[in-house]
């Protein structure tokens, strides 16, 4: 059976048809607006194989989000530096993803734990069309070190299986998107386990899908490689979504091509 390669197909599409655009960082991009990728989570864990992806950073970042944290110190303590470029001297990033997920402020001064609410809704009313988590808090964006790129996501249950669709307003295809695909696929597995559901699909929807000009050479190298079978995720059982630790996430049979380095546009 041929290996599905929606990510590599998107890279190819942007290289071939993307529009030349300027951007906030001054780097320049090839860009395409609006695209969707679908991954069957029963056909393997969608971790890109055409280059090695740093799985430790993916897992710790998701656990950091679920902690409701917005300071990089906890990440640094675990050897993860992917947020360092945007942090203040004290490590603070402002009210970014984790804060919005776990502690969205209301006008009355209360806070909403969107993740707990989403899990509760999956258990009580799996057919709800309102099961959405948003990191795009317009009133707090000026205080954020970086406005959310992966802005909001929705859960959907059919036939006892949980699917998740993410909307990503800004998609750095070479460096960022492989992380985002794996991170939300992992979150879907965790939420499904806690809700007593199987897994369905992870659906990624992108807005501005771009390849930075200084990543074109790396993307070309990546696309010259033959995709390999996706690995398998083994997730330990936990009583609570918020009890997971790094060692609970095991990715088996991950056999990627070597990593390809590229500069981050800040």
Swiss-Prot record:
DUMP binds at residues 24, 129-130, 169-172, 180, 210-212. Its EC number is 2.1.1.45. Signal peptide: none annotated. Its main location: cytoplasm. It comes from the Bacteria. It holds the Pfam family Thymidylat_synt. Gene3D superfamilies: Thymidylate synthase/dCMP hydroxymethylase domain (3.30.572.10). It catalyses: dUMP + (6R)-5,10-methylene-5,6,7,8-tetrahydrofolate = 7,8-dihydrofolate + dTMP. GO terms for molecular function: thymidylate synthase activity. GO terms for biological process: dTMP biosynthetic process; dTTP biosynthetic process; methylation. PROSITE patterns: THYMIDYLATE_SYNTHASE. It is an enzyme of class 2 (transferase). (6R)-5,10-methylene-5,6,7,8-tetrahydrofolate binds at residues 54, 172, 265. Pathway: Pyrimidine metabolism; dTTP biosynthesis. Homodimer. PANTHER family: THYMIDYLATE SYNTHASE (PTHR11548:SF9), THYMIDYLATE SYNTHASE 1 (PTHR11548). Belongs to the thymidylate synthase family. Bacterial-type ThyA subfamily. Catalyzes the reductive methylation of 2'-deoxyuridine-5'-monophosphate (dUMP) to 2'-deoxythymidine-5'-monophosphate (dTMP) while utilizing 5,10-methylenetetrahydrofolate (mTHF) as the methyl donor and reductant in the reaction, yielding dihydrofolate (DHF) as a by-product. This enzymatic reaction provides an intracellular de novo source of dTMP, an essential precursor for DNA biosynthesis. This is Thymidylate synthase. The gene is thyA.
């Amino acid at each position: 059976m041929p290996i599905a390669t929606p990510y590599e197909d998107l890279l190819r599409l942007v290289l071939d048809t993307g529009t030349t655009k300027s951007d906030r960082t001054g780097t320049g991009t090839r860009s395409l607006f609006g695209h969707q990728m679908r991954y069957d989570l029963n056909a393997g864990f969608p971790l890109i194989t055409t280059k090695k992806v740093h799985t430790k950073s993916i897992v710790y970042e998701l656990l950091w989000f679920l902690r409701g944290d917005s300071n990089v110190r906890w990440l640094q303590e675990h050897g993860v530096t992917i947020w360092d470029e945007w942090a203040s001297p004290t490590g603070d990033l402002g009210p970014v993803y984790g804060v919005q997920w776990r502690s969205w402020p209301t006008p009355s001064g209360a806070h909403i734990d969107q993740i707990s609410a989403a899990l509760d809704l999956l258990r009580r009313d799996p057919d709800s069309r309102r099961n959405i988590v948003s990191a795009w808090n317009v009133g707090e964006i000026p205080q954020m070190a970086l406005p959310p790129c992966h802005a909001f996501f929705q859960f959907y249950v059919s036939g006892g299986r949980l699917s998740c669709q993410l909307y990503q307003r800004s998609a750095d295809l070479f460096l960022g998107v492989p992380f985002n695909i794996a991170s939300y696929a992992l979150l879907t597995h965790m939420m499904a386990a806690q809700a007593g559901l199987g897994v369905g699909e992870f659906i990624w929807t992108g807005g501005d899908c771009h390849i930075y000009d200084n990543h074109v050479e790396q993307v070309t190298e990546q696309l010259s490689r033959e995709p390999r079978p996706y690995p398998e995720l083994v997730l330990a059982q936990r009583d609570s979504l918020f009890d997971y630790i790094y060692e609970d996430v095991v990715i088996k049979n991950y056999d990627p091509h070597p990593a390809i380095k590229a500069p981050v546009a800040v």
